[in-house]
């Protein structure tokens, strides 16, 4: 399957939320959608899932306008939302069948993912008796148990401890292995680099960078960092001889030595809102 966004534009009143957004993702690949809050990531996802209609542009699947009756989606929202007082197994089966899966297949799939995430012992418990991390695992299962064609993860690693983050990594790899289209929305580049072949970085509804991660990294000089931050003044003051602003409002930080890149990045992430 090939998913293609073609010149998608979305206008709310006088505000252009997305301006001519285009990208392509194929089955068996993960795609990273990056940007700070308000960049346009959520609007892009909602247009993809037919929550919003685009002002102009088109979405294609296998070179034909998308048919939402035949393409199935799995969506893990940043805001979690299952029934806290209901038994876990019952509601997972309910959601899988609600999304069109046969009950027998739903039972098999739910049991598979409960086992995959080491959650079988909790299947007959209520959701509100579980820890936050385990509740997130159940939410994850509800988004993929019905075997969707396209899986969308919206800030999936938010609030996860390292153990659960690793489990989620394994789920993502399994989805790619099963030939799904996987779309990540995140502001955490380290996770995006772990899974994604291609990325699209948004700022104020505009594409800043788009393409294959490896090729993008090769095309940029090793002695520079491109930074987008709310703390731009502090960064410019901290690195007065090394930092400058580009035409897009980003900061270009010139490294004294290329081998300092990792150390400098860690300092920036720790001390500033990057």
Locate predicted features.
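ABC transporter nucleotide-binding domains
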Residues: 10-184, 189-203
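Non-catalytic connector elements of ABC transporters
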Residues: 244-274
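ABC transporter nucleotide-binding domain
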Residues: 169-255
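Conserved catalytic Walker-motif region of ABC-type ATPase nucleotide-binding domains
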Residues: 5
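Alpha-helix N-cap/helix-start and coil->helix boundary motif
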Residues: 9, 66, 89, 189, ...
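Non-catalytic surface loops within mature trypsin-like serine protease
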Residues: 27, 121, 229-231, 257
């Amino acid at each position: 399957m090939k998913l293609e966004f073609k010149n998608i534009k979305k206008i709310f009143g006088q505000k252009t939320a997305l301006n001519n957004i285009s990208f392509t993702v194929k089955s068996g690949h993960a795609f990273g959608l990056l940007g700070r809050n308000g960049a346009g990531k959520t609007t892009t996802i909602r247009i993809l899932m037919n929550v919003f209609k685009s002002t102009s542009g088109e979405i294609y699947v296998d070179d034909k306008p998308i048919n939402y009756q035949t393409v199935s989606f799995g969506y893990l929202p940043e805001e979690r939302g299952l029934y806290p007082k209901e038994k876990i197994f019952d509601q997972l089966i309910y959601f899988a069948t609600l999304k069109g899966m046969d009950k027998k297949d739903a039972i098999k799939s739910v049991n598979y993912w409960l086992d995959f995430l080491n959650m079988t012992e909790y299947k007959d418990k209520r959701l509100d008796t579980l820890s936050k991390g385990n509740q997130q695992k159940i939410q994850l299962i509800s988004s993929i148990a019905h075997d969707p064609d396209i899986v969308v993860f919206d800030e999936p690693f938010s609030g996860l401890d390292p153990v659960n983050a690793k489990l989620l990594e394994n789920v993502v790899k399994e989805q790619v292995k099963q030939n799904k289209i996987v779309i990540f929305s995140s502001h955490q580049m380290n996770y995006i680099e772990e899974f994604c072949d291609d990325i699209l970085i948004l700022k104020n509804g505009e594409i800043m960078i788009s393409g294959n991660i490896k090729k993008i990294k090769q095309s940029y000089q090793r002695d520079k960092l491109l930074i987008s931050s709310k703390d731009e003044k502090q960064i410019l003051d901290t690195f007065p001889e090394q930092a400058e602003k580009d035409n897009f409002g980003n900061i270009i930080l010139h490294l004294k030595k290329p081998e300092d890149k990792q150390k400098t990045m860690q300092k920036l992430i720790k001390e500033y809102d990057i």
